[in-house]
Amino acid sequence: MVTQYKNLIGGKMVTTDQMLDVVNPATEQVIGQVPACGKAELDQAVAAARAAFKTWKNTPIEERRAAILAISGAIKENAEELYRLLTSEQGKPHDQAKGEIYGAAGMSAAQSTLSLDDEISEDSDTRLSRTRRVPVGVVAGIVPWNFPVMMAIQKIAPAMLSGCTIVLKPSPFTPLTTLRIAELIADKVPAGVVNIITGEDSLGPLMTSHSDIDKITFTGSTATGKKIMEGASADLKRITLELGGNDASIVLPDADPKKVAEQLFWSSFSNAGQICVAAKRVYIHEDIYDELSAAIVEYAKTVTVGDGAQQGTGVGPIQNKKQYD
């Protein structure tokens, strides 16, 4: 029987009548179902976040730090379950999934230590210039499918630390691990501070145009980023857009072809190449072009492509059919 996962709204795990299937990209089998949220559920999540903000914005920063550390601890304590689940929905090999899970735990712990103290840029006889960071309000976080857990934490922890509350939307392709984390932290974070809802891509525009959301943080494609900027312009929402890259590798003639071949391969094909900083262009000096090209081919032959859950797999499947096509 397929496991049905629930959303986190106002401190409670809730569901909807309609569900979305989540598929293992290696086997193409349905491995879970998640709520198909629409405007009504979004309104509930935003209302919960708005209500929680009234208290959370005044919560002492040490208590906010403690709540973030509780999230970090929950991820670390359940790391094996989480990285196996992540592999099943995203496709990346276990060692890479393990790196993402432990990386998310470490990132949240590190972000809990960031300083929000006032910064004095001038203190003279005639002028005092001070920068003070104040909570923005309710944040909408929209997360991609290539690093779903890392990107979720990268949005949740800073929002919490700064005194904001958040409504997070995972990708419909990879929501399971994030929802499992939601279940683990539901009793560790004050109700409404973190809300996690799932839905089709159509849920995103409802978030970006919602009148009671103050800031949007998005990681994904440049094309979608443009649409978010357009939607946010109606009421001048604050936005943070982390969009696709176009990274290059440049190889000089004194490089060791055998050593560089391995580095170039993984800079391009780690996570099946589904990384914004993946090398998409390679410039090789003509003096070593042939030798390095041959070395890359030979190294690629040693890498196993397959199910990320199988031991020895180096490169997992492309995550979804749209990306594959």
Task: Give the label of every model feature segment.
Residues 27-33, 213, 250, 304-305:
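Conserved C-terminal structural/oligomerization subdomain of aldehyde/semialdehyde dehydrogenase
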Residues 1-127, 315:
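N-terminal Rossmann-like NAD(P)+-binding subdomain of aldehyde/semialdehyde dehydrogenases
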Residues 119-259:
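Rossmann-like NAD(P) dinucleotide-binding subdomain of oxidoreductase/dehydrogenase enzymes
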Residues 223-325:
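ALDH superfamily catalytic-core signature
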Residues 23, 220, 284:
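A conserved hydrophobic position in a structured secondary element of the catalytic/binding core
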Residues 28, 64, 86, 163, ...:
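Residue-level signal for inorganic ion chemistry
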Residues 53, 57, 72-79, 83, ...:
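Structural signal for hydrophobic packing residues in well-ordered secondary-structure cores
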